[in-house]
Amino acid sequence: MSRPALVGRTVAAGAAGWAAACGLVYWRTFRRLPRSHRDSRRLTPADFELAYEELEVLTADRLRLLTWLLPGTRDAVVVVSGGYRGHISDVLGIGAALRRAGFSVVAYGWRGTPGSDTAPHTLGANERRDLTAVLDAIGDRLGPLPIGLLGYSMGGAVSISVGADDPRVRAVCADSAFADPVTLLEERLRHQLHLPAPVLADPVMALMARRTGARLAEFRPVAAVARLAPRPLLLIHGDADASVPVEHGRRLYAAAGDPRDLWVLPGVGHVGGYFANRTAYVERVIDFFDRALGEAGGPRS
């Protein structure tokens, strides 16, 4: 075989391998959940002896989301957003605590998770439509009540991004939120998959844009967080978080305006604060929303 032909075959093989690696990363990170998972059994608020109803929620791109409303005794609502590919029941612990403190609580399942319509996952880029649709449904069902957002991991990032530009939102608490998903993707490629970044991150994002229309680089909570001010922000992050390093929380805090607070939890991993010390965690979160929504969200007459 001639040298030019050998070089050509080598280049072609390398390109094919690179394309396959990009496809594998995309599939592992953003693939749809299998039907067996989407249809899995789940806990409901009834298992916590809490009354609830299902809200009709339809996103701008025509996806129906499983959504629970736990009616409270105060004229204020806290919307709880779970993590990436999370289950709606994941947030029932903190949701029940907020409900017992008098708040109405809304929990929902992201697109592509159990009970909601199937759709590709986009690490928050398209999921912002989900939270906006939930806020619309709350307005339709309960009227213009003050709303606080509590989000975990991707849910925290989405809560910051949506809350920054939605005047219906009076306060945001974000636990283990990432500052921007591109940095997070590059970190995971480098440290967890041992792959070069951004050599693979850029084509993976391009593949996502072609398949879902989501432009991950345009979803940057760290660029939006300053617009929350003067509404209060509470950031919670464990300093042993291996999924979203605590530096993400520090970046968000540095970019935010006042009033803001960063609660760093020593030795705690990803979204582990609630489980590390339920009493302290619940007290801190409820106190935050008491102060943020207190005047507007007093007891109903």
Regions found by a protein language model. Give the residues of each.
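Catalytic histidine-centered segment of alpha/beta-hydrolase-like enzymes
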Residues: 268-282
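Conserved alpha/beta-hydrolase
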Residues: 98-117
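Conserved alpha/beta-hydrolase "acid-adjacent" motif
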Residues: 242-248
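Short beta-strand/loop motif that positions the catalytic acidic residue
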Residues: 228-229, 235-237, 241
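Hydrolase active-site cap/lid region
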Residues: 161-217, 223-226, 231
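The serine-hydrolase catalytic nucleophile loop
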Residues: 84-97, 110
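An N-terminal hydrophobic leader/cap segment in hydrolases
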Residues: 6-58
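Alpha/beta-hydrolase active-site loop
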Residues: 121-142
